């Protein structure tokens, strides 16, 4: 994934913290860009 994304399963607070910052506060796998409760494409490449 993009180099600015944090590692999968690391803590996140904002959509800029990782490719998929879930509502649970954990980065989802960067290979899964659309997951329930996680960031969607509108959050990417900001």
From Swiss-Prot:
Kindly list the GO molecular function terms attached to this UniProt entry: sodium channel regulator activity; toxin activity
GO CC, one annotated term = extracellular region
Q: In this UniProt entry, which cysteines form S-S bonds?
A: 5-19, 12-22, 18-27, 21-38
**Top-level division of the source organism's lineage:** Eukaryota
Q: Tell me which tissues or organs this protein is expressed in.
A: Expressed by the venom duct.
* Keyword terms, alphabetized: D-amino acid, Disulfide bond, Hydroxylation, Ion channel impairing toxin, Neurotoxin, Secreted, Toxin, Voltage-gated sodium channel impairing toxin
PROSITE patterns, per the entry: I_CONOTOXIN
> Where this protein primarily resides, as one coarse class?
secreted
Task: Name positions with the PTM D-phenylalanine.
Answer: 44
As for what it does, the entry says: Iota-conotoxins bind to voltage-gated sodium channels (Nav) and act as agonists by shifting the voltage-dependence of activation to more hyperpolarized levels. Produces general excitatory symptoms.
Task: Give the family, as the similarity comment puts it.
Answer: Belongs to the conotoxin I1 superfamily.
Q: What is this protein called?
A: Iota-conotoxin-like R11.7
Which organism encodes this protein?
A: Conus radiatus
